[in-house]
UniProtKB/Swiss-Prot annotation:
GO terms for molecular function: heme binding; iron ion binding; trans-cinnamate 4-monooxygenase activity. (E)-cinnamate binds at residues 213-218, 306. Catalyzes the first oxidative step of the phenylpropanoid pathway in higher plants by transforming trans-cinnamate into p-coumarate. The compounds formed by this pathway are essential components for lignification, pollination, and defense against ultraviolet light, predators and pathogens. One of its GO terms (biological process) is lignin metabolic process. It is found in: Membrane. Belongs to the cytochrome P450 family. The keyword DNA repair does not apply. This is Trans-cinnamate 4-monooxygenase. Coiled coil: none annotated. Keywords: Heme, Iron, Membrane, Metal-binding, Monooxygenase, Oxidoreductase, Transmembrane, Transmembrane helix. InterPro entries: Cyt_P450, Cyt_P450_CS, Cyt_P450_E_grp-I, Cyt_P450_sf. It comes from Populus tremuloides (Quaking aspen).
Length: 505
């Protein structure tokens, strides 16, 4: 019976789509569309390009079709932009026109159909959420308030690694300890809380649920059902799992963090001057009626994924490149010892006077960009781009990884060479002052987390290189840096074992 119903549904949907296509051809506007592979009815280009739309596959398509190309993925138009000039149009010159976000069946679940800041459409709600989140998270005042905590967390990582007897011999998976550090860095800001160890049960619950959320959201496995509505019934099981994970996460955030902070606030009778952490500011906005409880939870949801995981990926990539390039690691260590003095542990203010460290961070973000396609943009209305018509509600992907790795724009881009940012690219910064290099995007929808990520990266990599010689495990000359690309993520495929030999000062 269920099979018969499914067959009828598929047949009816198929006929409806064919009719819609015919009507569209007869009545629709005549667009001058960007080039791309020839689509077929219903499926578009999906049968040709498949679900895996990672940055490297999209780069291959750009080499064939040009700096702007159109993929018809079922009912969705997907425009891929691969040049600095067109990226400037999307992100800056026409930032309002292309400033919205696309809908996605999985992200709709995890964000409550755009009740957060990152994935909401461009408009009043986005402006309100951005304003509410900026003061407690993304200002220099926040950096100065919490940088001592970041330094303490990095120091604790160093001590824990030194105490681990296996770290200096057969090696450890350093990422596990760094993950705890990143949770503590952000949970100090959010809730004035930290986790004592990797064995903390609440930390492990959070880590497991956030990891499952990332896996489900970043996978390409659900693209077919998102692109092609007649195939969506086959996604029911996947979407059910997403809904369950979302509900468990939000309940965890509410029970253990948001409600706990509310209780503390009620007992201390906090006034504005007494607000201690980000959630106090956000709950204050809720009390004023600016946002509701769901918005509060989705803000916490955003920070758990966007701030913690992306910075952790970049730290992990930076360590991997330093292990595989011992001469660069040695040069960085020499800078730290020379400019700071042996034994003087790097602090946040020190990061600004260490040019080679900053070059290492920039080069890591260039070659191993954590968000290689940025977060997708969308035009709410018909628009023009590069001399082509872009139909309303097209998904716009800026291939920021290719902008930063195109040999037409960069000298030997496949090489990990921090010196480029001290030599021919010395004026290029991570804040988007050059449209060839956009690790955090630029413009209205750029990532505000840059103000936190850069000092945390500098402090963490600096402390590790100051205190350890970082090496591949015995029997290996290098560690594996194979990539794992997602919907718009790029992390290392295998969490590597690292030998960390303590230095003596």
């Amino acid at each position: 019976m269920d099979l018969l119903l499914l067959e009828k549904t598929l047949l009816g949907s198929f006929v409806a789509i064919l009719v819609a296509i015919l009507v569209s051809k007869l009545r629709g506007k005549r667009f001058k569309l960007p080039p791309g592979p020839l689509p077929v009815p219903v499926f578009g280009n999906w049968l040709q390009v498949g679900d895996d739309l990672n940055h490297r596959n999209l780069t291959d398509l750009a080499k064939k079709f040009g700096d702007i190309l159109l993929l018809r993925m079922g009912q969705r138009n997907l425009v891929v932009v691969s040049s600095p000039e067109l990226s400037k149009e999307v992100l800056h010159t026409q930032g309002v026109e292309f400033g919205s976000r696309t809908r996605n069946v999985v992200f709709d679940i995890f964000t409550g159909k755009g009740q957060d800041m990152v994935f909401t459409v461009y408009g009043e709600h986005w402006r309100k959420m951005r304003r509410i989140m900026t003061v407690p998270f993304f200002t220099n005042k926040v950096v100065q308030q919490y940088r001592y905590g970041w330094e303490e967390e990095a120091a604790q990582v160093v001590e824990d690694v030194k105490k681990n007897p296996g770290a200096a011999t057969h090696g450890i998976v350093l990422r596990r300890r760094l993950q705890l550090m990143m949770y503590n860095n952000m949970y100090r800001i959010m809730f004035d809380r930290r986790f004592e160890s990797e064995e903390d049960p609440l930390f492990n619950k959070l880590k497991a649920l956030n990891g499952e959320r990332s896996r489900l959201a970043q996978s390409f496995d659900y693209n077919y059902g998102d692109f092609i509505p007649i195939l969506r019934p086959f996604l029911r099981g996947y979407l059910k799992i997403c809904q369950e994970v979302k509900e468990r996460r939000l309940q965890l955030f509410k029970d253990y963090f948001v409600d706990e902070r509310k209780k503390l606030a009620s007992t201390k009778n906090m006034c504005n001057e007494g607000l201690k952490c980000a959630i106090d500011h956000i709950l204050d906005a809720q009390k004023k009626g600016e946002i509701n409880e769901d918005n509060v939870l989705y803000i916490v949801e955003n920070i758990n994924v966007a701030a913690i995981e992306t910075t952790l990926w970049s730290i992990e990539w930076g360590i991997a490149e330093l292990v595989n390039h011992p001469e660069i690691q040695k040069k960085l260590r020499h800078e730290l010892d020379t400019l700071l003095g042996p034994g003087h542990q790097i602090t946040e203010p020190d990061t600004y006077k260490l040019p080679y460290l900053n070059a290492v961070v920039k080069e890591t973000l260039r070659l191993r960009m954590a968000i290689p396609l940025l977060v997708p943009h969308m035009n709410l209305h018909d628009a023009k781009l590069g001399g082509f018509d872009i139909p309303a509600e097209s998904k716009i992907l800026v291939n920021a990884w290719w902008l930063a790795n195109n040999p037409a724009h960069w000298k030997n881009p496949e090489e990990f060479r921090p010196e480029r940012f001290l030599e021919e690219e010395a004026k290029v910064e991570a804040n988007g002052n050059d449209f060839r290099y956009l690790p955090f995007g630029v413009g209205r929808r750029s990532c505000p987390g840059i103000i936190l990520a850069l000092p945390i990266l500098g402090i963490t990599l600096g402390r590790l290189v100051q205190n350890f010689e970082l090496l591949p495990p015995p029997g290996q000359s290098k560690i594996d840096t194979s990539e794992k690309g997602g919907q718009f993520s790029l992390h290392i495929l295998k969490h590597s074992t690292i030998v960390a030999k303590p230095r003596s000062f």
